[in-house]
Design a protein with these regions (language model features):
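Cytoplasmic membrane-interface "Motif A"-like loop-to-helix N-cap segments
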Residues: 22-37
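Intracellular juxtamembrane helix-capping segments at the cytosolic ends
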Residues: 70-85
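A late C-terminal transmembrane helix in Major Facilitator Superfamily
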Residues: 86-120
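A membrane-interface helix-boundary motif in multi-pass transporters
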Residues: 28-31, 113-146
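Multi-pass alpha-helical transporter architecture, strongest
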Residues: 47-49, 135-164
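C-terminal ends and interior cores of transmembrane alpha-helices
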Residues: 38-52
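Residue-level signature of mid-helix packing/kink "hotspots" within the transmembrane helices
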Residues: 7-15, 101-105
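Loop-to-transmembrane helix entry
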Residues: 1-9, 91-95, 134-137
């Protein structure tokens, strides 16, 4: 039920991102996107390594939802459109979409391999054989990917929109 908080705040993050970039940053999306990326990494860290208290889990899902809402709006389309001429905006969105699905697929494969290679069979207290998954490596992989996701857009910080 706690994870259900995420999409509610994701909607708020999406709506808020447009207002924030247009009114506060005059259409410059790099600073709010960077901030949302850092917030997403912090929220993921809290969720994975924050101790598991009820408050920490709820806080991590609130922050994660807001951050993902902003990032999906910006990185999923708006920043790509900002970097290319208007005539190429459809192609830019298509490339971002394909790259997103390819990266998500690769993430699923790597996550599966990390979990498969860090799984042990154990006998529980009542004598049943159970499978135990060690999420240590996969958690660090997810956190590393989150950090990369806010560092990569910095490569285009000085780039201006191309005009046609």
């Amino acid at each position: 039920a706690i994870i259900g908080i995420n999409p509610i705040f994701g909607v708020l993050g999406t709506v808020f991102s447009g207002w924030l970039s247009d009114k506060v940053f005059k259409g410059d999306r790099k600073y709010p996107a960077f901030t949302a990326g850092v917030l997403e990494a912090i929220s993921l860290y809290l969720f994975l390594f924050g101790g598991g208290s009820h408050f920490t889990l709820i806080l991590s899902m609130v922050l994660f939802g807001i951050a993902i809402g902003v990032l999906i709006s910006f990185l999923g389309g708006l920043m790509a459109i900002d970097l290319v001429p208007r005539k190429a905006s459809g192609a830019a969105l298509g490339i971002v979409g394909v790259a997103s699905y390819a990266a998500a697929g690769l993430q699923n494969v790597v996550t599966g391999l990390l979990l498969d290679n860090n799984t042990v069979e154990a006998v529980n207290k009542i004598g049943e054989t159970v499978t135990k998954h060690d999420f240590t490596y996969v958690s660090w992989f997810w956190l590393g990917a989150a950090v990369i996701s806010f560092l990569l857009p910095m490569l285009n910080w000085r780039r201006r929109r191309q005009e046609i």
